[in-house]
Amino acid sequence: MSERSLVLFELAGADQSVRFSPHCWKTRMALAHKGLTAQGVPWRFTDKAEIAFSEQTGVPVLVDDGITVSDSWRIAHYLETHFPQAPSLAGDNSGLAACAFVNHWADATLLPALARVLIPDVFHVLHPKDRQYFRASREARLGMTIEQLPTYRQDYLTELKRVLAPLRGTLKRQPFLAGHAPSYADYCVFGMFMWSRCVSDIAIVEPDDPIHAWRERLLDLFDGLARKAPVHHLTTGDL
């Protein structure tokens, strides 16, 4: 849709084609929703100097013809403001602010619950140079070693099912969080599911769960953008 030069710095694993950050997937889906494409640049946890120009230390970082925007939520607002003729990320709602609660819920509630399940798999996806940093930061946060986490995985999956209850209840009544068409609210949550899909073959929802059908719909959006994305582990049943 636009001839502007967009560059997106995304978290990558040892295989640089595997881009697994949930926050980067929020942005990747938002770009596709707007009909935009960006050159993806692989970035790793220890490559902080490569995004020093953004004056912060995490991804996603979007560069639009010399303008730098970091943080997936700020990027969404930037895209909504600077590409007003493209489809709105707010869907049928009155504005992007309507997605704010879902974005916060995904980051503050869903992500921590899912992290306890996925961190051992994430560790193996990482480039070796990132593993020491990842181990130290995550073990300090969780209060146990990465190797201890699988012992409690079934408990974590049970808790994750409980955490997903509001999402499940909503999707029983409508195909997308925004109603009959997807919005940035859907992408905020879907980013978490892409994180799981890219790094692990663990089934976090059952086939008869309304969330499963919703995830399938999101995977098929934009000519299968997310479904075609390279993954580290993928079972036949997830294809």
Regions found by a protein language model. Give the residues of each.
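Long, positively charged, glycine-interspersed low-complexity recognition regions
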Residues: 196-239
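Amphipathic alpha-helical segments that form well-ordered structural scaffolds
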Residues: 26, 30-33, 78, 159-170, ...
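GST-like fold's C-terminal all-alpha helical module
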Residues: 106-213
